[in-house]
């Protein structure tokens, strides 16, 4: 398949109000002249980004406000996105995380994570894949997983579980696609410097995090060149290769010590009630 050409084409970006989604939207508009459909919960941030990109990149931008932990919102958003039949690509980036002891994760929090990271992704993917299969149009999707989906991460147990599902789901679905002009890419970055990793619990792990501009640029490269699975960063790829050669129990144990140390330090720095 040929590379994607984004100029004057409509591309959906979920989770576009901050972090990786916001930066991908900026780069798609400024560097590739893509028209954008920005989806997230925070309308004020989406409208601000829309105004910026329409003015600076001279592209068209639509805003769709939706809470992806709510299936009614998801279905209404998909209807809105597909109604004119012009969608060319989609980046499913929205997600929530939790860093802490799994026993302290509230059930409502877990349900929100599951709905946002898994259920909404599958729901949107089902509808968009069906659209491209039925129409035969050229297009592509980039689904954001994580290196936490490749290797279980203690103290992010639920989060890494959701990302492992996304990784396995997308890798399998790639081989069911019948439209020869449509591709699926699963993107598995390590930690990224974003709003999601700005909390105290992540303070000691900041040195491991990739700058968001680099993560966005590599994600768009993987999307445009239709990679099947892509891990950004040479060190991440090399590290992932060697981690696959070592016993899983050993790797998970080492990660557990690093993450627990960061968590304990963060907890110790919090003011006592």
Q: Where does each model-flagged region fall?
A:
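Substrate-binding pocket helix/loop in short-chain dehydrogenase/reductase
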Residues: 101-102, 106-114
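C-terminal helical subdomain
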Residues: 186, 204-240
């Amino acid at each position: 398949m040929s590379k994607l050409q984004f100029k004057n084409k409509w591309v959906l970006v979920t989770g576009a109000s901050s972090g990786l989604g916001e930066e991908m939207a900026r780069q798609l508009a400024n560097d590739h002249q893509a028209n954008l459909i920005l989806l997230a919960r925070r309308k004020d941030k989406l409208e601000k980004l829309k105004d910026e990109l329409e003015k600076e990149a001279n592209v068209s931008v639509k805003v769709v406000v939706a809470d992806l932990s709510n299936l009614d919102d998801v279905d209404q958003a998909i209807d809105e996105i597909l109604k004119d039949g012009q969608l060319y690509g989609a980046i499913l980036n929205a997600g929530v995380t939790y860093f802490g002891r799994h026993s302290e994760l509230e059930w409502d929090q877990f349900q929100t994570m599951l709905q946002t990271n898994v259920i909404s992704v599958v729901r949107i993917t089902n509808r968009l894949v069906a659209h491209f299969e039925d129409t035969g149009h050229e297009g592509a999707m980039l689904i954001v997983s994580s290196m936490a989906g490749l290797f279980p991460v203690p103290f992010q147990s639920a989060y890494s579980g959701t990302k492992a599902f996304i990784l396995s789901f997308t890798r399998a679905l790639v081989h069911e696609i019948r439209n020869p002009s449509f591709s699926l890419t699963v993107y598995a970055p390590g930690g990224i410097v974003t709003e999601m990793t700005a909390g105290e619990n992540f303070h000691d792990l900041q040195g491991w995090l990739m700058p968001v501009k680099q993560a966005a640029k590599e994600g768009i490269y993987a999307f445009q060149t239709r990679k099947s699975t892509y891990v950004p960063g040479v060190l991440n790829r090399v590290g992932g290769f060697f981690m696959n050669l070592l016993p899983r129990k050993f790797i998970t144990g080492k990660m557990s010590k690093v993450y627990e140390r960061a968590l304990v330090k963060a907890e110790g720095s919090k003011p006592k009630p």
